[in-house]
Amino acid sequence: MTTVNAPEFVRHPKLIAWVEEIANLTKPAKIEWCDGSEEEYQRLIDLMIANGTMQKLNQEKHPGSYLANSDPSDVARVEDRTYICSQNKEDAGATNNWEDPAVMREKLNGLFEGSMKGRTMYVVPFSMGPLGSHIAHIGIELTDSPYVAVSMRKMARMGKAVYDVLGTDGEFVPCVHTVGAPLAEGQKDVAWPCNPEKYIVHYPETREIWSFGSGYGGNALLGKKCLALRIASVMGREQGWLAEHMLILGVTNPQGEKHYIAAAFPSACGKTNFAMLIPPAGYEGWKIETVGDDIAWIKPGEDGRLYAINPEAGFFGVAPGTNTKTNPNCMATLHKDVIYTNVAVTDDGQVWWEGLSKEVPANLTNWKGQPHVNGEKAAHPNARFTVAAGQCPSIDADWENPAGVPISAFIFGGRRADTVPLVSEAFDWVDGVYKAATMGSETTAAAVGQQGIVRRDPFAMLPFAGYNMADYFDHWLNLGAKVSEKAEASGNKLPKIFNVNWFRRDAEGNFVWPGFGQNMRVLEWIIDRCEGRANAVETPIGFVPTYEDLNWEGTEFTKEQFDLITNQDKDQWVTEIESHTELFNKLGERLPKALKERQAALLEAVKTGF
């Protein structure tokens, strides 16, 4: 039997007993209690270099940075192997995979039995959110992956201080992770152990996370999507707050007025770029600061305003496409102390990925560790960087404020070649919830004259809501109603809700809107709408700006181009709104009546108003 040997700084009997229980099940060779120290981090990195899991990069160009290459079968989140095992199938809903918790526990017990043999079990204590914040929550991850242990040090507040907050009886979310590759005595390990069979399992009622078979990011760093979205969304519903797949940014105008915005976009729609936006020419004196690029926990304050924290402490970003043009702040963040995964590497130890430079360097080693062949991808399309958020030059001064930052507006957006205009403001909270609930994004780049397939991704939460999506919509509606009363009593108001679409195309299939830094022009209008000083035109689908309502200083974007990305076509909108029925039917009887009514009213308005 493995000795638990909890260090003195762990004073939580229930936690120690749980570690012992999991050790008896998984049978690791030894247990290591992580303290989050620099010494521990370096020791684990050196261990992985010796094992061939990681390689040291050129320390002149990439100080303190390392590269891991995963097994080619273990490169992304596995949505089809991700389960919400609520007691009642209906509570998971039609958009989640469900299995009876008793059946799943039996299955997992079999898989986890002896799964850590020959390996070290790391006890990784972490806080999602600033330590001690009333918005934060603590998790403990037991993992046999040193890659997970070092990555969690960047992605969360990880280490000894967590135990001080936890004390002798504090609450924590138990997270168990194994790569599912036990080692027999004398068996040589592989560089990236994993198992073809994978399970990412959440038990919402008992707030547990069990992950088997994958060493990759979102499947293995259990504080991220598993705790911060799937389990936290369940907690938020019960406790009256929101856990959202949103970036948070701060905008300050030249007069010193500051607003915080939370925005939800599906994957590959530019969340990180938007969170770190640099204002373009014509916006001298404006400042954009980053609170978070992926997840927001939002709680109502006593004053009826909604306050958000970024529960993470790092960025786990997609590398391909990132460069000094698309995201200079992100590139500056990567100047040191980065863990790269599945990028390519040059013969002198520098990283490379598609989009980093026009020229492909000679003598490149691809993400599979083989010489790069022209015409093939050198970096995996989902290659990642893991880096501490504090290194970001645009990080907001209040990004770790335990009280959170007050949100003025929510923005929702997807990738649409037509139909949806550049920006529109919802008529009210219910209308905004309807628009977010039905937002769609094209899964394929639309060819000329051919629409991509629109995948409904409600609130950009389709893979991340830990309970029935219809109940999730209901929670948003109820929260709005509750907070609205409180806000009015304090002279405040609910955040406004906006929809954006940076991805409209012209007849030739080209993007019309330049995007990136130019999105600032839309952001300024949004803020001015929040302050009640910008004009808008009422249309059947919301309030939209005219060409004259936006600031065009420093650019030559024409009225004709603007009309191309803001025009609204009656037939397209009728088709669009009717297509929402498919999602609503899938969600069944639990769908809030208010959303069906909104659909009928919107359809009527579109048919008669254009």
Swiss-Prot record:
InterPro entries: PEP_carboxykin_GTP_CS, PEP_carboxykinase_C, PEP_carboxykinase_GTP, PEP_carboxykinase_GTP_C, PEP_carboxykinase_GTP_N, PEP_carboxykinase_N
Cofactor remark: Binds 1 Mn(2+) ion per subunit.
EC number: 4.1.1.32
Family annotation (Pfam families): PEPCK_GTP, PEPCK_N
Compartment(s): Cytoplasm
Domain of life: Bacteria
Metabolic or biological pathway: Carbohydrate biosynthesis; gluconeogenesis
Record-listed GTP binding positions: A268, C269, G270, K271, T272, N273, R384, R415, F516, G517, Q518, N519
Major localisation: cytoplasm
Keywords, alphabetical: Cytoplasm, Decarboxylase, Gluconeogenesis, GTP-binding, Lyase, Manganese, Metal-binding, Nucleotide-binding
PROSITE patterns: PEPCK_GTP
GO molecular function, one term: GTP binding
Gene Ontology CC: one annotated term: cytosol
CDD domains hit by this protein: PEPCK_GTP (cd00819)
Reaction(s) catalysed (UniProt annotation): oxaloacetate + GTP = phosphoenolpyruvate + GDP + CO2
Alphabetical GO biological process terms: cellular response to glucose stimulus; gluconeogenesis; glycerol biosynthetic process from pyruvate; oxaloacetate metabolic process; propionate catabolic process; response to lipid; response to starvation
Catalytic-site annotation from UniProt: C269
Binding-site residues, substrate: R77, Y216, G217, G218, S267, N382, A383, R384
Keyword Zinc carried by entry: no
Residues reported in the UniProt entry to bind Mn(2+): K225, H245, D294
Family: Belongs to the phosphoenolpyruvate carboxykinase [GTP] family.
Annotated function: Catalyzes the conversion of oxaloacetate (OAA) to phosphoenolpyruvate (PEP), the rate-limiting step in the metabolic pathway that produces glucose from lactate and other precursors derived from the citric acid cycle.
Complexes and interactors: Monomer.
Name of the protein this chain belongs to: Phosphoenolpyruvate carboxykinase [GTP]
